[in-house]
Amino acid sequence: MSKSIFIVYGHYNTKESFNASIRDAFIEEAKKNGHEIDLINLHDEKPISFYDGSEPDEQILDYRKRLEKSDVLFMISPCYNLRATAILENWIDKTLAPKFFFSFKRIVGNWGYPIAGAMKGRRAIMSMSYGGNWFSIQTWFQNIPFRRIKAGVLKLGGMKTTYIRFYEVLPGMTKEKFAKHMERVRKLVKRI
């Protein structure tokens, strides 16, 4: 069944990076499988202001409208200092915000629970690439982005989350290893 996929790309190199290869392989395979793509390369967009308590502007409202039309949200970022890129984190803060993405049901005082909003029950995919190996990343660094984004943001919005992680993504990666990573991306698309 054809899906509408909203891709948010958060790497500064939109042409020749490993993350650009992930994006391009995903889009190519998705189109082969009949899916529709709505792509935002954040570094090619008008810069998003940082959250200051004001109401969302037209740019954020447009992102939300496009997101509401989608079946799948796919975010792509390298890991910088144990976080997604600042530009993607800012997009998350502004776009996947209350009361659009979730609201809060107060029970007593400040105690309560989140209520999923516009994207409830839809699928989210988070792609993260790391320069380090899987053992050091998963053993020593417990505040890694995929856990915080999944357990915090995406869970609040009621989304079903899938992760695809790439370790030891460094210049000089062998062609064989690169090809295996791209095959994982193609397999991911086939499971949508």
Predicted features and spans:
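A generic structural motif
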Residues: 33-38, 159-161
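Glycine-rich phosphate/pyrophosphate-binding loop and the adjoining helix
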Residues: 136-192
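Short hydrophobic segments within beta-strands
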Residues: 8-10, 40, 127-129
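A short, flexible beta-alpha/helix-coil linker loop
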Residues: 11-13, 45, 130-135, 168-172
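N-terminal beta1-alpha1 ligand-phosphate binding loop
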Residues: 2-35, 167
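Glycine-rich, highly charged phosphate/nucleotide-binding loops
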Residues: 52-69, 181-184, 188-191
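N-terminal beta-loop-helix "entrance" segment that forms/cooperates
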Residues: 39-58
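Helix-loop-strand module that forms the ligand-binding subsite of alpha/beta enzymes
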Residues: 56-148
